[in-house]
Swiss-Prot record:
GO terms for biological process: proteolysis. The gene is pepA. GO terms for cellular component: cytoplasm. Mn(2+) 2 binds at residues 270, 275, 293, 354. It catalyses: Release of an N-terminal amino acid, Xaa-|-Yaa-, in which Xaa is preferably Leu, but may be other amino acids including Pro although not Arg or Lys, and Yaa may be Pro. Amino acid amides and methyl esters are also readily hydrolyzed, but rates on arylamides are exceedingly low; Release of an N-terminal amino acid, preferentially leucine, but not glutamic or aspartic acids. Presumably involved in the processing and regular turnover of intracellular proteins. Catalyzes the removal of unsubstituted N-terminal amino acids from various peptides. It comes from the Bacteria. This is Probable cytosol aminopeptidase.
Length: 503
């Protein structure tokens, strides 16, 4: 689908369709008022007859409106004008895309980007419109034999901006929006792929393909079990012992700043391509969704794709920590004591708390890059789902400025996170009689104690942890990966690169 921006009057648009908003109760938006004036009150007369109230999601498609060059006008309800916030704006865009697609409009000029959204500028409105449009049109049908396609799918969308001054920021918004949307799609595709296809080797192949596509400044190295053993990554290796699929760690290095002083930002993604729970096996109900336990790695892959596509002037390293947690004769057990790459020992009390055992060794491994900051992304704890539900990602950090940056990026992008504490009191729950620490700390504050566990391996750099257990996928009828927190991390890196979306 093609996107562009222009600045022009609605009555002069030669297009298959013009999209304008109507507020509740039956109040025309400024652009709709212009069209109504040109058409001698044609639109307001329809509203007076009760054809459209302006409630969110309502639509009315008009054909051959007098004195308007466009073939059709799509009126879309935007709710009450004062209540139009970012969430409602995205819903309106989503409804617009679905309606245009369902009614066979192959192209349209959208004036919704001229609506006032509280606290948001032109760049944000255009970028979010692009991201929302791509999200709305997403489907995962690679493995279906019968693929359904719209009769005449929407191919071109033009976003109108108030004046020519906004064209540059609008074009930049489209560029950024498309790159972020492509990263989200890549993350969703990886997450939705079944575990018999998407194993650690598959993750590694995707990482290698990324380097092939952006060979100018992307290098991928894949570290297998033998090399991990030589590095002393015994905790990581233990988790994958029960699986016939080899554990593989894929390291994607993007260099956008050649300066010797430019330290990288490192992103670490948990890549459990299937988590049965191991010997501490999970209940069978819902276990199919444990293919989503690699959504952290999928998100990191999507972000690296976005960074490479935009050629950001920063250095970023993405690590996909791929493995599979299965029961078996070689599987690790409750009661085992593991020696991590850092030299610290861990008593395993539950083999289903495996993500932290993989991540702790990767967090030690990345010390060699002397990072500016390290952010790990993981579907780590069910406790985070209980704490924050399915709408907000959990955030923990050992560095306040980094945490504040991530919270700001989450607000800018609409991919929200909430900070949880990392207090010494919680560390006490990880005490073990037989090792330096246990891998679980009991039910109270489970998301926090998981973060506390990881914090013991991050003392040499600024670090943040994103627990996406509640936000990485949806269940039920809408089952599928969400691609979060690609948008959050993309905004964080855009801000670091100097593109903060301010006009």
């Amino acid at each position: 689908m093609e996107f562009s921006v222009k600045s022009g009057s609605p009555e002069k648009q030669r297009s298959a369709c013009i999209v304008v908003g109507v507020f509740e109760p039956r109040r025309l938006s400024p652009i709709a008022e212009q069209l109504d004036k040109i058409s001698d009150g044609y639109i307001s007369a329809l509203l007076r007859r009760g054809e459209l109230e302006g409630k969110p999601g309502q639509t009315l498609l008009l054909h051959h409106v007098p004195n308007v060059l466009s073939e059709r006008i799509l009126l879309i309800g935007c709710g009450k004008e004062r209540e139009l916030d970012e969430r409602q704006y995205k819903q309106v865009i989503q409804k617009t895309i679905n309606t245009l697609n369902d009614t066979g409009s192959m192209e349209a000029v959208c004036f919704l980007t001229e609506l006032h959204v509280k606290g948001r500028n032109n760049y944000w409105k255009v970028r979010q419109a692009v991201e929302t449009a791509k999200e709305t049109l997403y489907s995962f049908d690679q493995l279906k034999t019968n693929k359904s396609e719209p009769r005449r799918p929407l191919r071109k969308m033009v976003f109108n901006v108030p004046t020519r001054r906004e064209l540059t920021s609008g074009e930049r918004a489209i560029l950024h929006g498309l790159a972020i949307a492509a990263g989200i799609k890549a993350a969703k595709d990886l997450g939705n792929m079944p575990p018999n296809i998407c194993n650690a080797a598959y993750l590694a192949s995707q990482a290698r393909q990324l380097a092939d596509s952006y060979s100018k400044n992307v290098i991928t190295r894949v570290i297998g079990e033998q090399q991990m053993k030589e590095l002393g990554m015994h905790s990581y290796l233990a988790v994958g012992q029960g699986s016939q699929n080899e554990s593989l760690m894929s390291v994607i290095e993007y260099k956008g700043n050649a300066s010797e002083d430019a330290r990288p930002i490192v992103l670490v993604g948990k890549g459990l391509t299937f988590d049965s729970g191991g010997i501490s096996i999970k209940p069978s109900e819902g276990m199919d969704e444990m293919k989503y336990d690699m959504c952290g790695a999928a998100a990191v892959y999507g972000v690296m794709r976005m960074v490479a596509e935009l050629q950001l002037p920063i250095n970023v390293i993405g690590v996909l920590a791929g493995c599979e947690n299965m029961p078996g004769g070689r599987a690790y057990r409750p009661g085992d004591v593991l020696t991590t790459m850092s030299g610290q020992t861990v008593e395993v009390l539950n083999t289903d708390a495996e993500g932290r055992l993989v991540l702790c060794d990767v967090l030690t491994y990345v010390e060699r890059f002397e990072p500016e900051a390290v952010i790990d992304v993981a579907t780590l704890t069910g406790a985070c789902v209980i704490a924050l539900g399915h709408h907000i990602t959990g955030l923990m950090a050992n560095h306040n400025p980094l945490a504040h940056e991530l919270i700001a990026a989450s607000e800018q992008s609409g991919d929200r996170a909430w900070r949880l504490p990392l207090g010494d009191e919680y560390q006490e729950q990880l005490e073990s009689n037989f090792a330096d620490m246990a891998n679980i700390g009991g039910r109270p504050g489970g998301a926090i104690t998981a973060g506390c566990f990881l914090s013991r391996f991050t003392r040499k750099y600024n670090w943040a942890h994103l627990d996406i257990a509640g936000t990485a996928w949806r269940s039920g009828k809408a089952k599928g990966a969400t691609g979060r927190p690609v948008a959050l991390l993309a905004q964080f890196l855009l801000n670091r690169a100097g593109f903060n979306g301010e006009e």
